[in-house]
Amino acid sequence: MILRYARSEFARIWEPQTRFTIMFEIEAHAADKMAELGVIPKEAARTIWEKGRGVIFSVDRIDEIEREVKHDVIAFLTHVTELVGPEARFLHQGMTSSDVNDTALAVQLARATDLLIEDVDLVLAALKRRAMEHRMTPCVGRSHGIHAEPTTFGLKLAGHYAEFQRTRQRLVAARAEIATCAISGAVGTFANVAPEVEAHVAEKMGLAVEPVSTQVIPRDRHAAYFAALAVAGSAIERLAVEIRHLQRTEVLEAEEPFDPGQKGSSAMPHKRNPILTENLTGLARLIRSAVTPALENVALWHERDISHSSVERAIAPDTTVHLDFALRRLAGVIERLVVYPENMLRNLDRLGGLVHSQRVLLALTQKGLARETAYAAVQTNAMRVWRGEGDFMAFLKADPIVRPHLSDIELADLFDLGYHFKAVDTVFARVFGD
């Protein structure tokens, strides 16, 4: 976990102290149910809570024990015994290490996802506000990076808003899939621990019961979870790349905030670089990098091997922390994005009306020209404009094929910018429901 990207509230989820507290709660809740079932003395279960609740576990001591025993859960339980005393012998009855580790990881991932969903809500709020602000701000739409037809900047942002709505839905679904509890023993048969114990722990920890566990919770759940985070990362990158392109000097339709005192380059004092969105592009790569190892974790040997553990110790904190940072940074960029409507109009007019070529084509076909003939006439004049020979409207008015079919008034109407925005309200109603 890179501290540069970890805000304190999020980092706490992945601190060893938090994990040990969760592990203790799992063990203690299991002991409660075992006491109720008569497996262990009720007084022992009470003592476990009395001596263990709210305790600060010694991470150094647990690490010291683990260096000797080479087993993380045994090291933890040994330290708990040092704190709780003889009653600690009733902990972990019939349980296996993965019962504790997997369930604890599920709690951590669920908590992390709750914060990620809050982050997405920040992005959605910023996108909605700016989309409404620029609902009818004209700009050029581009395909293959080349001018296509007019759109509005609000429509661009509305598309990203809809994408982040889907991102939110995926995170909600991913949380539900990952938030499962397994307390089923060495190979998942409940031979030495009752299913009622699992159900009790699941309820207390806010989890669902894993229907069929082996020694572990099946890793397809984790693969799906990290895939959902990866798609969220790609949604971030798509918007970040859009902003980076719009900030190019020769485009300059929108720009990241640039604060007083900020420096863009150690060598060139004039630079205003899109460093925030470039950073988001890089973080998206890191977030997506978790998917392949998460998928490879699915095919564990038989009832379980440990090959997944080292992977998850890295990708669980790293990926969630990176996504949290990226979402919050993106929300800030959108909230403070500098928009240049005048530059958008200038760029829209840069090709001298070529963005209206489809309307001219359609009008000619509706006047009776064959599509091939109409296309050839419009394209011939458009290519002259591309070569810098003159104005599109003037060429069309002088064209022997176009002129007999379209009057000056009709041609002027075909170049009306507002025509392209007649469905903006419909799209906004679909997206925002307003």
Positions of predicted regions on the chain:
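Glycine-rich cofactor-pocket loops
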Residues: 132-154, 253-264, 270-271, 302-311, ...
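A helix-coil-helix interface module used to build multimeric assemblies
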Residues: 1-190, 194-200, 209, 262-265, ...
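C-terminal alpha-helical interaction appendages
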Residues: 336-405, 421, 426-433
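Glycine-rich anion/phosphate-binding loop at the beta-strand->alpha-helix junction
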Residues: 167, 215-308, 313
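Amphipathic alpha-helices that form helix-helix packing interfaces
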Residues: 30-33, 116, 120-123, 127-130, ...
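Active-site-adjacent "gating/activation" loops or surface patches in catalytic cores
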Residues: 198-215, 219
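Long, amphipathic alpha-helical stalk/connector segments used for oligomerization, subunit docking
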Residues: 286-371, 377
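Alpha-helical support elements that line or immediately flank enzyme active sites
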Residues: 31-32, 108-120, 229-238, 243, ...
